[in-house]
Amino acid sequence: MTKKEQALIEQYAKSLVQVCQERDTLEALQADVLAILEVFKATNLAKTLSSLAVPRAKRLELVRQLQGDNIVYLNNLLEVMLQNEREAYLYQVLLRVLSELASVSNQYDVTVTSAVPLSEEQKQRVRTVVSKRLAVKTGRLIEKVDPSLIGGFMISVNNKVIDTSIRRQLQAFKMNLK
């Protein structure tokens, strides 16, 4: 992706977040964007919208189906992107919107990797640890299971990592023995 395309994506995303922040509709925007991104993940919509083999009329129809019950500002963005023939960038714009929302609200997705699935109590404790140690609000809690950790967990938030896994401790111990 070129710098010009990245700047374009960033401009669309920042503009939408700014308007929604002024109108106090950030939570509704986040819910709508997450719902649309789920559609992208469940289907091959990103490839379809960027494919020149798919007729423009079909791409217009697909994006208009996404409009539905979204907040008006998101629907306006979708319409502007269609008018400017930039539907191929929609997926990247929506991802960037989530990133902008996180930075504006200081609320980030938390990825927890553990050897076994976490209980609800453990998930709540993770949220507490993140808010206290990293000084951020927790958005969605994304849970991953990796048996190679042996025990403990890894928390990743906004490019910050807390790693208390047994695997890391064993690696550190091994390095100390050298």
Curated annotation (Swiss-Prot):
Membrane topology: Peripheral membrane protein
Keyword Membrane: yes
Predominant location: membrane
Native organism: Streptococcus equi subsp. equi (strain 4047)
PANTHER family, per database record: ATP SYNTHASE DELTA CHAIN
Function statement: F(1)F(0) ATP synthase produces ATP from ADP in the presence of a proton or sodium gradient. F-type ATPases consist of two structural domains, F(1) containing the extramembraneous catalytic core and F(0) containing the membrane proton channel, linked together by a central stalk and a peripheral stalk. During catalysis, ATP synthesis in the catalytic domain of F(1) is coupled via a rotary mechanism of the central stalk subunits to proton translocation. This protein is part of the stalk that links CF(0) to CF(1). It either transmits conformational changes from CF(0) to CF(1) or is implicated in proton conduction.
Family: Belongs to the ATPase delta chain family.
InterPro entries: ATP_synth_OSCP/delta_N_sf (IPR026015), ATPase_OSCP/dsu (IPR000711)
SUPFAM superfamilies: N-terminal domain of the delta subunit of the F1F0-ATP synthase (SSF47928)
Keyword vocabulary terms for this entry: ATP synthesis, Cell membrane, CF(1), Hydrogen ion transport, Ion transport, Membrane, Transport
Protein's recorded name: ATP synthase subunit delta
Subcellular location as annotated: Cell membrane
GO CC terms, sorted: plasma membrane; proton-transporting ATP synthase complex
One of the record's GO molecular function terms: proton-transporting ATP synthase activity, rotational mechanism
Quaternary state and interactors: F-type ATPases have 2 components, F(1) - the catalytic core - and F(0) - the membrane proton channel. F(1) has five subunits: alpha(3), beta(3), gamma(1), delta(1), epsilon(1). F(0) has three main subunits: a(1), b(2) and c(10-14). The alpha and beta chains form an alternating ring which encloses part of the gamma chain. F(1) is attached to F(0) by a central stalk formed by the gamma and epsilon chains, while a peripheral stalk is formed by the delta and b chains.
